[in-house]
Design a protein with these regions (language model features):
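Small-residue-enriched hydrophobic alpha-helices in membranes
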Residues: 1-112
C-alpha cells in the first residue's frame, strides 16, 4: 500500500474519530485523492478499517501512521488530516486527540 493510500486511510480514520463519516469529510477526502491522483473509495476504506481493525480507530491510526515513513509524506499527511478535521467547520475533542496522537507518534518536528 502506497504512502498516499495510507495518508488517505488516515484521513478516513480522522473522519470516523468523531463517530461519523459526514458528507463534508467525505467530499474533502475525495478532493484530496483527486489532488494526489489516487483512485480512492471512501466507503470501501471505511468498511476495510472496520473489518481489519474491528472498529478500533487507535489501532488503525497506529497502523497507518507506521506505514508513512518519508518526511515529506508525513508533512503532507498531516496537512490532509487537518483539512479533513476542519472540513465540517468545527474541531471536536476526539479530532484533537487524533492530532495529538499523530504528533506523539511522529514527533514535534512535523507539527507547526
Amino acid at each position: 500500500m502506497s504512502e498516499k493510500t495510507n495518508s488517505l486511510n488516515l484521513c478516513v480514520c480522522m473522519a470516523l474519530a468523531d463517530h461519523g463519516l459526514g458528507k463534508d469529510e467525505t467530499a474533502e477526502i475525495l478532493k484530496i485523492a483527486k489532488e494526489i491522483k489516487v483512485d480512492f473509495n471512501v466507503h470501501n476504506a471505511t468498511d476495510e478499517i472496520n473489518e481489519k481493525f474491528s472498529g478500533d480507530l487507535d489501532v488503525a491510526q497506529d497502523f497507518y501512521l507506521g506505514n508513512i515513513t518519508k518526511d515529506n509524506s508525513k508533512l503532507q499527511a498531516k496537512e490532509f488530516v487537518k483539512r479533513v478535521a476542519l472540513s465540517d467547520g468545527e474541531l471536536k475533542d476526539k479530532e484533537v486527540r487524533f492530532l495529538v496522537r499523530m504528533k506523539q507518534a511522529w514527533g514535534y518536528q512535523y507539527f507547526d
